[in-house]
Design a protein with these regions (language model features):
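A short beta-strand element within the Helicase C-terminal
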Residues: 112-124, 143-147
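Conserved interdomain hinge at the start of the Helicase C-terminal
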Residues: 18-69
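Conserved nucleotide-binding/hydrolysis micro-motifs of P-loop NTPases
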Residues: 58-60, 82-83, 107-110, 125-129, ...
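Conserved segment of the helicase C-terminal RecA-like domain
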Residues: 135-179
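Interdomain hinge/linker at the junction between the two RecA-like core domains of SF2 helicases
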Residues: 1-35, 170-174
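Conserved helicase ATPase core of P-loop NTP-dependent helicases/translocases
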Residues: 62-67, 73-110, 133
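Basic Arg/Gly/Lys-rich low-complexity intrinsically disordered segments
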Residues: 1-8, 68, 96, 163-164, ...
Length: 209
């Protein structure tokens, strides 16, 4: 009897659409060279939360870890250059609340068995829309997802939104100006000419920040 009820719940709970709808999502358009500064500003509002930051490379994970530690964030990076015992130790500290921020890659995130994640911050978008949903699914509960999107990543964002059948809310931080919408080459799913996602001059402070 329990098998009959558990299986459908598991399937529905991890369905891409369900994951997207249960997660509060927002996107910040930003030039690549401004991402580090924006990350620090955003994390100031999440110092007490359990945060996972996902990047594309081990080198970037190391650099962000060093930066955040220099700003007195309780952060640590975990990637393929670390031994399995080191990865497990970091995950245990995170799950116990002794570590607030883990910076990692998609590949390692799948092995860490992290709990109580409140925010998934995509410093880099993944290489596919499917991996974006996988990132969100690791929260397992209601949570928040923030994506920092550089101009070259906007076509992938369009793919993600197309699969989700919903445009992710755009937010802007005071002091950060998004670039003009890049010239796409057929990858973008929707016409953004009437409402460009990267705006040159309009800067507003995020409400509640």
């Amino acid at each position: 009897m329990s098998e009959q009820t558990d299986t459908p719940e598991e399937s529905i709970y991890h369905d891409q659409r369900s994951v997207a709808l249960r997660t509060t999502q927002s996107v910040y358009f930003v030039q690549e060279h401004d991402k580090v500064s924006m990350l620090g500003s955003l994390l100031n509002d999440h110092k007490e939360n359990q945060v996972v930051i996902v990047v594309k490379s081990k080198k970037k994970a190391d650099a962000l870890s060093e930066f955040l530690i220099s700003k007195e964030f309780n952060a640590h990076c975990v990637h393929g250059n670390h031994r399995q015992a080191q990865q497990k130790e970091a995950a245990t500290k995170f799950n116990l609340g002794a570590l607030n921020i883990i910076i990692t890659t998609d590949m390692i995130l799948k092995t860490l068995e992290l709990e109580n994640i409140k925010l998934v911050l995509s410093y880099d978008l993944p290489d596919s829309a499917q991996n974006y949903y996988i990132r969100l699914a690791f929260m397992k509960e209601l949570g928040e997802a923030i994506a920092l999107v550089s101009p070259e990543d906007e076509p992938l964002l369009s793919d993600i939104e197309s699969n989700m059948k919903k445009e992710i809310e755009e937010k802007v931080l005071e002091g950060f100006v998004a670039s003009a919408t890049p010239n796409h080459t057929g990858k973008t799913k929707k016409d953004r000419t009437k409402k460009p996602r990267h705006r040159k001059n309009k800067v507003k402070k995020e409400q509640g920040a």
